[in-house]
């Protein structure tokens, strides 16, 4: 069976849920629930960080609700416990990060999975080296193929070798998604800002950065369709691209095409707006690094110029009028005037724009857009007896993604809304102690992907943010 992010197994019993992680879920006793750690045994963990362990101990002690404390203990270290493969090659750190139940490294997921550990690297040299290894591996991946979204650990080939695109043995999958090039920039930039260490910005990373810049320009499609195309023999419409693999037509207006979304689903209109916002932030971050670290003002200026061009195009073409919510940001556009009003659970999303430093959380346009995407006017916003939240076409109608509930909490400044998000997350882990890819809006035991490290670590990030900014919230039972 081919294991991709589209592949999922619906688990309808809590007992089965822990099998893939080597753990046994704990059920409530007749007296009181007992929450035993669902982490692997110490000897079986992929990587152990003293700084992470100290944070777990500290934050757990400040969480009144024992089940939420248990979820935090299980989820926050899940990436380190189960998905990282650290080594040294040619005397340099190298870290391969799998998604969880898929044995491949997504550029997006690998960046997001280690992101919440960045604030700790100044106090943990081992953790710092591990993230250096991620940066190094990602630069190599970009050089191999900037259009690929997921990579193998080595040149082993893939079950997707038959896709009609330019596959290479190092690639797991070759779906062009703008954010696959933005996430590594975000990780590198913030690693530099937090640690003060610029050694990662070597010849290899600078080469990768220039490839990112060139790829973004190429996918503005000012000079034709460009070299990328993708077709797959499939029964799932969103798993392949129309028009012989080049996607639906666009008018070159300065925006960047993304043939696939961060969900790995094909775009309808290739100017994917959340990802274009993300690209602007990434280009400005690259400009700063090329200038301050590399003293390469020519590349820095080129990055700034492209960022300004995309930003101007967003302001002109990525504002729409919704009959109920007024002026909002559309999810996708084509430059001809067509706009798609929706949001998806995967990040980048419209909901997540402040999280990615693309807009201010109090920006009026973002706030009106937020109200839209968190309403039933968004075709992928689902309300059920288990919870309510954003899903998407990747899994299907009626399935809410914990990631979207988490992101709603992270981007909220409303304590009541944050409390509600934590309540939903507590109520929908189906007794497993972990976040999942998605769950049925009316039955949380009907879920997909029992081992999805990004969602787990992101839950940890939510709790850390609440602990820092709204500690009183954690002094209640949810």
For each predicted feature, which ranges?
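Active-site-adjacent bridging/hinge elements
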Residues: 80-93, 156-164, 249-261, 431-437
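Aromatic-rich carbohydrate-recognition surfaces in CAZymes
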Residues: 103-131, 135-238, 453-467
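Well-ordered alpha-helical scaffold segments within catalytic/enzyme domains
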Residues: 51-64, 112-125, 183-198, 277-296, ...
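Extended ligand-binding clefts on enzyme/binding-domain cores
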Residues: 107, 142, 147, 154, ...
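C-terminal capping/lid segments that line or modulate ligand- or cofactor-binding pockets
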Residues: 163-169, 174-177, 340-360, 398-478
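Low-complexity, Ser/Thr/Pro/Gly-enriched N-terminal "stalk/linker" regions
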Residues: 11-14, 30-108
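N-terminal export signals
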Residues: 7-29
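Extended, well-ordered alpha-helical scaffold segments
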Residues: 71, 125-141, 197-217, 286-317, ...
